[in-house]
C-alpha cells in the first residue's frame, strides 16, 4: 500500500536560529520502492523557502554524485551497442592523448575511469571548464594525476573521471551529452530529468528544489520558478552560445559527475530498473550482464590499495566511507576492518551511490536480495553532524532507515 506523508512548516524559515535547527533539513524527501513500484513516500519542508513551496517527491533536485551512476548506465548502453569498449585505450576515440605522465605506456580505459582507478585526481579542477574550453587542458596539467600510483592499482575517488567519460560518449555518437542521455536513458524509462537544465522542460525547471548553505542562503538552483538563462559555464567571452559545442571537446559542460536534475520518484524508476536486471515496465534498457558489470566491485579496500574518503571540501566525507566500488556503483556494508560504509546499520549488502554537494545529501540504494530500495535527499544540511554508526552523516542514517 502506498502511503504519502507531507509536512511543510515555518520551522524551515528559521534554519540559522540555533545550532540544533541548523542540522534540520530545509527539505527532505524519501521514497521506498520494490520491483513493482513505490511503496512509501515521505516529504517534508520547503523546496523553495522564498516562494513557500512545499517539497514533493516529483520535484527535480541537483542530485550530486548519484549522477555518476546514471552517466554509467548511459555509457553501458553504448558498450552494449558496440560504440564503446570498457577496456579499450580511450586516447584514439577522444582525439587527444590521455595518459598518466609518470606511466605513459599504460592505457586509460573506460573501466578505469568509471571505477576511479585511472590515477586521476581533482587537484587540477574538473567542473569549471568554460563553454569554449577544452577538457584536455585539465588532463594535460600534471596536478590532475596521482604521481604515487599507476593506473589500475589504486582507488582514488575523483570527479574528473566523469567529464572524460562524457567526452568519450560524445565522440562515440556525435551527440551532445545531455541530449544523448535523454535518448539513451530518460526517454526509454519515462523519467523527467536532465543534466544542467538545458534539455528539461520549463515546467520541470519551475519545480526545482533550491539548495541552501549552512546559513540558509540559497547556493544553487534559485531560479525563481524559471529555467536559468545559461545552464552551463559561460565561454571566455561570457556568452552562452551552445552552437560552439564540439563532440568530446568539453565533457564537463553538462556536469556528468553531479549535475543531474531528477526527482526522487524519477530516481526510484532507475532503481527499479536495476532491481529488475535492466527492465522497467516491460522496457529493457540493459541486459542483465551489463547490470552485473555495473554493480560488481572492481575494487575492494585493503590497507594499501585505495582511499576510503573523498578528497573534497564538504567536510562530510569520513574515513571508511568507500570500501567497495564497481562501475560508478558503491557497495555498502563491507565487513572489513576500517570500513564504516553502512548507513542503514543492519549489515545488509546494498548497491547504489551517495551524493553530497551545495548543502545537499542524497542516496540511491537497492537491496537485490529482498528486491527493495530507497531514494532520499535532504537540502540545507551542510553542517549535518556525524552519524552514530557509520561514516555517513546523522541525516543520511535517518533517511536511509526511514526514521525521524
Residue map of PLM features:
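Active-site SXXK
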Residues: 30, 36, 60-90, 162-170, ...
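Short, conserved catalytic-motif segment at the N-terminal edge
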Residues: 23-61, 83, 144
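Short, surface-exposed loop or secondary-structure junction motifs
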Residues: 48, 101-348
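Sec/Tat signal peptide C-region and signal peptidase I cleavage site
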Residues: 18-22
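Short, glycine/proline-biased beta-turn/loop segments that scaffold the active-site neighborhood
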Residues: 86-101, 187-189
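Bacterial N-terminal signal peptides that target proteins for export
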Residues: 1-8
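Short, surface-exposed beta-strand/loop micro-motifs that present aromatic residues
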Residues: 352, 360-370
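Bacterial N-terminal signal peptides
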Residues: 8-16
Amino acid at each position: 500500500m502506498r502511503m504519502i506523508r507531507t509536512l511543510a512548516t515555518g520551522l524551515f524559515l528559521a534554519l540559522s536560529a540555533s545550532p540544533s535547527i541548523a542540522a534540520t533539513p530545509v527539505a527532505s524527501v524519501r521514497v521506498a520502492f520494490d520491483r513493482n513500484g513505490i511503496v512509501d513516500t515521505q516529504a517534508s519542508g520547503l523546496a523553495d523557502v522564498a516562494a513557500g513551496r512545499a517539497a514533493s517527491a516529483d520535484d527535480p533536485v541537483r542530485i550530486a554524485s548519484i549522477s555518476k551512476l546514471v552517466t554509467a548506465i548511459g555509457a553501458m548502453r553504448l558498450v552494449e551497442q558496440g560504440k564503446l569498449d570498457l577496456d579499450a585505450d580511450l586516447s584514439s576515440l577522444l582525439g587527444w592523448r590521455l595518459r598518466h605522465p609518470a606511466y605513459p605506456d599504460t592505457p586509460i580505459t573506460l573501466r578505469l575511469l568509471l571505477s576511479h582507478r585511472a590515477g586521476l585526481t581533482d587537484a587540477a579542477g574538473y567542473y569549471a571548464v568554460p563553454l569554449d574550453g577544452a577538457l584536455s587542458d585539465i588532463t594535460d596539467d600534471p596536478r590532475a594525476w596521482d604521481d604515487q600510483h599507476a593506473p589500475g592499482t589504486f582507488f582514488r575517488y575523483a570527479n574528473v573521471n566523469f567529464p572524460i567519460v562524457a567526452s568519450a560518449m560524445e565522440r562515440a555518437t556525435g551527440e551532445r551529452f545531455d541530449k544523448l542521455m535523454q535518448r539513451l536513458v530518460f526517454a526509454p524509462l519515462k523519467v523527467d530529468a536532465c543534466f544542467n537544465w538545458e534539455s528539461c522542460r520549463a515546467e520541470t525547471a519551475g519545480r526545482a528544489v533550491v539548495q541552501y548553505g549552512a546559513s540558509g542562503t540559497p547556493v544553487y538552483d534559485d531560479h525563481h520558478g524559471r529555467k536559468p538563462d545559461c545552464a552551463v559555464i559561460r565561454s571566455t567571452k561570457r556568452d552562452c552560445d551552445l552552437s560552439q559545442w564540439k563532440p568530446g571537446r568539453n565533457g564537463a559542460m553538462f556536469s556528468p559527475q553531479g549535475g543531474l536534475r531528477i526527482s526522487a520518484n524519477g530516481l526510484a524508476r532507475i532503481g527499479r530498473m536495476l532491481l529488475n536486471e535492466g527492465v522497467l515496465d516491460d522496457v529493457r534498457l540493459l541486459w542483465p550482464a551489463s547490470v552485473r558489470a555495473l554493480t560488481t566491485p572492481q575494487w575492494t579496500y585493503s590497507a594499501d590499495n585505495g582511499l576510503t574518503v573523498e578528497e573534497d571540501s564538504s567536510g562530510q566525507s569520513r574515513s571508511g566511507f568507500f570500501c567497495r566500488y564497481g562501475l560508478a556503483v558503491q557497495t555498502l556494508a563491507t565487513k572489513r576492518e576500517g570500513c564504516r560504509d553502512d548507513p542503514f546499520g543492519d549489515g545488509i549488502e546494498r548497491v547504489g551511490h551517495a551524493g553530497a554537494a551545495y548543502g545537499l545529501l542524497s542516496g540511491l540504494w537497492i537491496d537485490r536480495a529482498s528486491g527493495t530500495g530507497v531514494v532520499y535527499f535532504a537540502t540545507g544540511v551542510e553542517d549535518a553532524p556525524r552519524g552514530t554508526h557509520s561514516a555517513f552523516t546523522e541525516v543520511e542514517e535517518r533517511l536511509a532507515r526511514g526514521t525521524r
